[in-house]
C-alpha cells in the first residue's frame, strides 16, 4: 500500500509500483483533495484522513498490507497504526512528517510578526509570510493544512506495535534527520536507514530504495501474489 505526500499524488510512486507489482499485489491511492481526487468539502485533520483511508481499505478488501508512506502519508499511516495494530503488517516511512521540534527564536519572531500584521492586512500577511505550498491552497485546504501541520504525532508513534523502518534521505531539508531520530526514539520497533537523496529519496535513487524496502518487507524472498 502506498500513501503519498502533501500536494502530491500516487504517481510519485510510479517506479515503486512498477517494481513491486511484478511480484506482489500493489495498491496506491490519491488522498481526498490531491491527484485529481474529489475536493474536500470541509477541512480534514490527520485523524479525518486516517478514517477516510480505513474506509478505502474496507472498500478494496485490503487486509493487513505492508505500507510505504511518504511525508504527509506518514502522518496518516502513523495515526492509523496507532489506532489499530492489525491494519498494517510492516510500515516503511520516508521523508516522515509529523514531528514538531523546538522552534528557533527566528521562527517565533516570524510567527509573532505574521500574527500582528494579519490583524491589519491579512492578504499581505499571507503573501509575505505564508509557505509556498500554503499559498496555492483553497480556503478549505488551508484550514485543513493548519490542522495537519500543527499536530505532533510522537504520542501516536509510541502506540505503534508494528515493525517500522524509516528511510531518510541524507539531503532532506524538508523533514531533516532530527525529525526522523525523534520518531525513532518513540517507536517500539523502529529502525532508521539513511540513503543518498533528498525529501523524495525514493525517486532520487529508486533502485536502492526499492531494494531496502523489499529486504525489510520480505527479507529478499519474493512471494508470488496476484495483482
Regions found by a protein language model. Give the residues of each.
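Conserved HGGG/HGGXW glycine-rich cap/lid loop of the alpha/beta-hydrolase fold
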Residues: 1-36
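Active-site loop/oxyanion-hole signature of alpha/beta-hydrolase fold enzymes
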Residues: 14, 27-68, 211
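Flexible "cap/lid" loop of the alpha/beta hydrolase fold
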Residues: 75-83, 88-120
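Conserved alpha/beta-hydrolase catalytic His-Asp/Glu region
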Residues: 101-162
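Short beta-strand/loop motif that positions the catalytic acidic residue
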Residues: 159-160, 166-168, 172
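Conserved alpha/beta-hydrolase "acid-adjacent" motif
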Residues: 173-179
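Catalytic histidine neighborhood in serine/cysteine hydrolases
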Residues: 184-200
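Catalytic histidine-centered segment of alpha/beta-hydrolase-like enzymes
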Residues: 198-211
